Amino acid sequence: MTTAQSAWGIGLATVTADDQVLDTWYPTGKLGLGELPLVPGEDEADVLDLPPGAVGDRALPGLRTVQLVTVLSSLADPIKDAADAYLRLHLLSHRLVRPNELNLDGIFGKLANVAWTSAGPCPPERVDELRVIERAAGRHLTIYGVDKFPRMTDYVVPSGVRIADADRVRIGAHLASGTTVMHEGFVNFNAGTLGASMVEGRIVQGVVIGDGSDIGGGASIMGTLSGGGTEKVRVGERSLIGANAGVGISLGDDCVVEAGCYITASSKLTLPDGRVVKARELSGVDGLLFWRNSVTGGLEAKPRSGQGIALNAALHAND
């Protein structure tokens, strides 16, 4: 559910000669919700307290860094431009808003496709030109990816989290304190955790994971970016999606999906009383075990007794 809350940010944008914004970085403390907090007589340029050389031309001719101020009257409004999109993504990664609490419709059309390099963002068609410049300076240019979304950690490093492979977490991911993302875990924008969680599988756009839950190695959760689906999946607290398992329905609290078991919304599940239902009828129900009967091969669901899983506290003490 989107919020009508206003927001602001003062940041640095990388801009091409034809005024295309490649990225915008809003430093910690220079963005927030509500009105832009300037005192009378204060100029936006004074707020960032930039060191010499922070703005101006970059090594690649035609590329420059500029300071800009972005003010959003409502996070429910459509995205206006790239600077607007980056502010919304920063608000998520700074944990100022939660996934699905702001309007991100059409974001792909507002972001440029960028080569993310060790020398900063670059138009993909000019990578070789930048490579020559870097080699002339005695540096080797590394290309981290060519995409519309950069790595979150190049812009925001949230407190209290561990991320084993920074390439696996996009800007706009929401990682609550106590979250651990292992090497094979992946977190997309407008997705993430609401409490201490173990992420060894994939959390796709729009999906949120409750406190104390575990997404096992190779596990996946169906999202809305492909296939035409509109329902956003939520995993409750103290739930486990086992290794190489997956879900296309929401899980309530204290649920377990057996390793290797994939439950789509239309999957037929046999209940303990013999009834057969579609999985969507159990979406969001607490205290269930989903598993595949190794004798019949059929998918089954049955109530679980007691509370859900318990994470290893030592793995989530990340401060």
Curated annotation (Swiss-Prot):
One of its GO terms (cellular component) is cytoplasm. GO terms for molecular function: 2,3,4,5-tetrahydropyridine-2,6-dicarboxylate N-succinyltransferase activity; magnesium ion binding. Its main location: cytoplasm. Mg(2+) 2 binds at E184. The active site is at E200 (acyl-anhydride intermediate). InterPro entries: DapD_actinobacteria, Hexapep, THDPS_M, THDPS_M_sf, Trimer_LpxA-like_sf, Type2_DapD. It is an enzyme of class 2 (transferase). GO terms for biological process: diaminopimelate biosynthetic process; lysine biosynthetic process via diaminopimelate. Coiled coil: none annotated. The keyword Metal-binding applies. CDD domains: LbH_THP_succinylT_putative (cd04649). It catalyses: (S)-2,3,4,5-tetrahydrodipicolinate + succinyl-CoA + H2O = (S)-2-succinylamino-6-oxoheptanedioate + CoA. Mg(2+) 1 binds at D167. It is found in: Cytoplasm. Pathway: Amino-acid biosynthesis; L-lysine biosynthesis via DAP pathway; LL-2,6-diaminopimelate from (S)-tetrahydrodipicolinate (succinylase route): step 1/3. Succinyl-CoA binds at R202, G217, S220, A243, E258, A259, K278. It holds the Pfam family THDPS_M. Keywords: Acyltransferase, Amino-acid biosynthesis, Cytoplasm, Diaminopimelate biosynthesis, Lysine biosynthesis, Magnesium, Metal-binding, Transferase. Homotrimer. Belongs to the type 2 tetrahydrodipicolinate N-succinyltransferase family. NCBIfam families: DapD_actino (TIGR03535). Catalyzes the conversion of the cyclic tetrahydrodipicolinate (THDP) into the acyclic N-succinyl-L-2-amino-6-oxopimelate using succinyl-CoA. This is 2,3,4,5-tetrahydropyridine-2,6-dicarboxylate N-succinyltransferase. The gene is dapD.
